[in-house]
């Protein structure tokens, strides 16, 4: 999305705050998956993404995120 220059700093801080509320483990896996995929063929990247997704789904933080969403509360991520 395009943000006016005058609003860029505030929007950046707001986005950073949203990211900081997420699971550090899941963010690490996501970043690694995207970076790794940039150097792969599409088929290899999709296979890699599928393998990494299993790590995400098995993570305790993923379960905590789902439970928090269903219970309409803030998630308490542990990085595990």
What do the predicted segments below correspond to?
Residues 1-47, 54-55, 60, 76-80:
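C-terminal long alpha-helix characteristic of the crotonase
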Residues 72:
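Conserved N-box asparagine in the HATPase_c
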Residues 66:
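Flexible, glycine/charged-enriched surface loops at secondary-structure junctions
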């Amino acid at each position: 999305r395009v943000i006016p220059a005058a609003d860029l700093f505030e929007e950046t801080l707001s986005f950073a705050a949203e990211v900081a509320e997420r699971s550090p483990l899941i963010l690490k896996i996501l970043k690694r998956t995207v970076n790794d995929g940039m150097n792969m063929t599409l088929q290899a990247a999709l296979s890699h993404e599928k393998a990494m997704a299993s790590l995400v789904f098995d993570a305790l933080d993923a379960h905590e995120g789902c439970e928090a969403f269903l219970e309409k509360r803030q998630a308490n991520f542990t990085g595990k």
